[in-house]
Design a protein with these regions (language model features):
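N-terminal basic, amphipathic alpha-helical segments
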Residues: 1-102, 307, 311-318, 339, ...
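Short Gly/Ser/Thr- and Asp/Glu-enriched loop/turn motifs at secondary-structure junctions
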Residues: 34, 140-141, 368-372
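N-terminal small-domain helix-loop-helix segment of the aminotransferase-like
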Residues: 57-149, 156, 330, 398, ...
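Conserved core segment of the aminotransferase class I/II
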Residues: 97, 274-343
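Conserved core of the PLP fold type I
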Residues: 106-246, 257-275, 345, 442
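Hydrophobic residues in well-ordered beta-strands that form the structural core
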Residues: 170, 191, 250-252, 325, ...
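Conserved glycine-rich beta-strand-loop-beta hairpin in the small C-terminal domain of fold type I
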Residues: 343-353, 365-378
Length: 445
């Protein structure tokens, strides 16, 4: 029993429970109702995906139509949503958020709208600044601008540091939202190879900044979408130094930063910012309130420019949702929610990885992120993830093919899976079906 384990080890019951939960989340043990914990069967792990081409230049970005089609499929409740970009909605504290929204609605006055114009709700910005401070970072509330989700943060940041026609360094593969933003703002992408484990190739980035007049670098430092990569601390330092020496702004997309599986949150590159040239963007959409669409940017020396750009576009972020989030963060047990969320995501990622290892051909490579909720898979280069996408969709399963995350025809043998959903027979069968389809593609040659 847990109590006996604690006595033998000289540990408290709470410490033993937390240790067992960690082992379960990592797939080492399984819990059986009214029976206890057992050592889990560990299938042979699959190899990790490889790094793509080091440096790719795209003068034009145009992928919107295809992304729209893929995302539309994920809205169908009869489709297994492995291709979705959104976390399982059942993971979030909806009743508490609803009560907070109801409470602030009763207090809402016409003055509230004026008081919450950019840079946004004062209480919410103070709370975000406090969370930065707790992680060892000094970010003033005046530097923080509340936005309509992370995408607005990122778009405003791009507009603040670039002009149409400028070159922007991005990851390859990249979050398709970045590609869409570059297309909309008529910017040129310089795609830098990114490894599923340790992130952007800094040698390739250095080559790029020497070869092109790059004005900004946009990347995810933690649990990158789609690969799940996290930039090691030494690489963050090298990245910040490289960009600072060339006066290149860094737009740090950190929407998955709170979804870590380790003991401590990895520090953003923003923690190393000495000149205010790093714009740190994040959101509550992936960790608390997907439907609220509230994000922020700690914009450094660009804070006033970002505020002006927001006033000229969306004017402000939804005021009731800002107020509700500020109320929830003060009273709602946010950190307790985050601990539960991380534990569940770690368990679900482990369950999906084990199912893949059991059912997929051994030639398939799969990432092993330390957080977030995406897995990146690599097929034999001769196989097409687009064809797999079409065949899977005809059988009620969505995936996100690699083409979504590139400006060209790269990563056509790769795809992304969403691992945030509670594992059950439906998802296990979907993995089995994908395995059969992959074998069918290989047999067809």
């Amino acid at each position: 029993s847990l109590r006996e384990s604690g006595k033998r080890a000289g540990l408290s019951l709470m410490t033993v429970v937390q240790s067992y939960q960690l082992l379960e989340s990592q797939g080492w043990i399984v819990a059986r109702p009214q029976s206890g914990y057992y050592v889990a069967a560990r299938p042979q792990p699959l190899p990790q995906p490889s790094r793509g081409e080091k440096l790719l230049l795209s003068e034009q970005v145009d992928i919107n139509a295809f992304i729209f089609d893929v995302l539309q499929a994920c809205k169908d409740p009869d489709i297994v949503p492995f291709g979705s970009a959104f976390p399982d909605a059942t993971l979030f504290a909806q009743p508490k958020l609803a009560r907070a929204l109801s409470s602030v609605a009763r207090k809402f006055t016409p003055h509230s709208s004026l008081a919450n114009l950019p840079p946004g709700n004062d209480a919410l910005r103070r709370h975000i600044a406090q969370r930065y401070a707790l992680s060892g970072m000094q970010v003033a509330p005046d530097e923080i601008v509340i936005t309509a989700g992370a995408m607005e943060s990122l778009s405003l940041s791009l507009q603040a540091v670039t002009q149409p026609g400028d070159y922007v360094a991005i990851e390859s593969p990249a979050f398709y939202g970045a590609l869409q933003a570059l297309e909309r703002l008529r910017l040129k992408a310089v795609a830098i190879a990114t490894h599923p484990q340790d992130g952007i190739d800094l040698d390739a980035l250095q080559q790029a900044v020497e070869q092109y007049p790059i004005k900004a670098c946009w990347l995810m430092t933690h649990f990158q979408n789609p690969q799940g990569a996290t930039l090691p601390e030494a690489n963050k330092q090298r990245l910040v130094t490289l960009l600072r020496d060339r006066q290149i702004s860094l737009i740090e997309d950190d929407v998955y930063g709170e979804l870590y599986f380790s003991a401590e949150r990895p520090l953003p590159a923003k923690a190393l910012d000495s000149g205010g040239q790093i714009l740190h963007c994040s959101s509550f959409s992936k960790c608390l309130a997907p439907g609220f669409r509230v994000g922020w940017v700690a914009a450094g020396r660009y804070a006033q420019q970002v505020q002006r750009l927001q006033l000229m576009s969306t004017v402000s972020t939804s005021v009731p949702t800002q107020m509700a989030l500020a109320d929830y963060l003060l009273h709602g047990g946010y950190d307790t929610h985050l601990r539960r969320l991380r534990r569940l995501l770690a368990q679900r990622q482990s369950a999906m990885r084990q199912a893949i290892a059991h059912h997929f051909p051994p030639t398939v490579k799969v990432s092993q992120p330390d957080g977030g909720y995406f897995l990146w898979l690599e097929l034999d280069p001769a196989l097409s993830s687009m064809e797999l996408y079409r065949r899977a969709l005809s059988r009620g399963i969505s995936i996100a093919p690699g083409r979504m995350f590139t400006t060209g025809d790269h990563f056509n043998h790769c795809f992304r899976l969403n691992a945030s959903f509670e594992w059950n027979d439906r998802f296990e069968e979907a993995i089995k079906t994908l395995a059969k389809l992959i074998r069918g593609l290989a047999a067809a040659g």
